[in-house]
C-alpha cells in the first residue's frame, strides 16, 4: 500500500478519481492514514472506558493494548493499511511533552495516547523522567501488541478465536508491564 494505486484499490475508488479528490497521492495517503488512525484510537478509547475511574496507569496501558488488538481484529485490512501508510514520528522530544506543542512531527492520535499513558504511569510511580526511557517503554509496548496483532490478523495465529487472542494479549501485556515495573523500579498498584 506504499503507493496511492494500492490505497485507492483497497478503498474501491479509481486512482484518477482518488488523486483528483485529494489533490495528488500524498494527500490521499495522509487522509487514509488519519482516518485509519482515528479508527484505531476509537478502539483504544473503548477499551479504556471500561476501567473504573482512578485505575492505575498500568491498567490503562493494558487496556490500550486490548484496544489496539480490537482494532486489528475488527478491521484487519485497515490495520495492515495503517501500518503501510504510517508516516509519523514515534520518538518523543521530551518526557513532559504531551504531543501537542513541542513535538516537531505529528505522532498521530493513537500513538500520542499510548505515549501519554506510558509517561503518566512512569510519573505516577515516580519513575525516571527521561525521553529515552519513555521512548524505549513505548517501543516495547507497541512492538509487543503490534506483533501479536499482526500474528492474529495476517500471521500464523489468524485462525483462532477472539477469546484466544485476548487471553494471549493479556499474558503478553502482563509480561511487558512487569518488565516495565522491574526495569524502572515502578510501584505496582495494591
Protein language model annotation of sequence segments:
Residues 80-83, 90-91, 127-130, 154-161, ...:
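Short, hydrophobic secondary-structure boundary micro-motifs
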Residues 1, 15, 19-45, 62, ...:
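An amphipathic alpha-helix adjacent to DNA-recognition modules
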Residues 4, 8:
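The alpha-helix within a helix-turn-helix
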Amino acid at each position: 500500500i506504499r503507493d496511492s494505486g494500492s490505497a485507492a484499490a483497497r478503498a474501491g475508488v479509481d486512482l484518477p478519481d482518488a488523486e483528483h479528490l485529494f489533490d495528488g497521492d500524498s494527500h490521499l495517503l495522509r487522509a487514509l492514514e488519519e482516518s485509519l488512525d482515528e479508527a484505531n484510537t476509537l478502539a483504544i478509547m473503548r477499551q479504556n472506558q471500561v476501567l473504573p475511574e482512578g485505575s492505575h496507569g498500568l491498567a490503562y496501558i493494558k487496556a490500550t493494548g486490548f484496544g489496539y488488538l480490537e482494532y486489528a481484529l475488527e478491521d484487519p485490512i485497515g490495520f495492515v493499511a495503517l501500518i503501510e501508510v504510517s508516516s509519523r514520528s514515534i520518538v518523543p522530544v521530551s518526557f513532559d511533552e504531551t504531543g501537542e506543542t513541542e513535538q516537531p512531527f505529528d505522532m498521530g492520535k493513537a500513538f500520542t495516547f499510548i505515549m501519554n499513558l506510558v509517561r503518566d504511569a512512569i510519573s505516577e510511580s515516580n519513575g525516571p523522567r527521561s525521553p529515552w526511557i519513555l521512548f524505549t517503554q513505548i517501543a516495547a509496548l507497541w512492538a509487543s501488541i503490534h506483533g501479536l496483532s499482526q500474528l492474529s490478523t495476517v500471521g500464523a495465529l489468524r485462525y483462532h478465536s477472539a477469546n484466544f487472542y485476548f487471553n494471549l494479549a493479556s499474558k503478553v501485556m502482563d509480561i511487558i508491564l512487569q518488565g516495565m515495573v522491574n526495569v524502572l523500579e515502578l510501584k505496582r498498584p495494591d
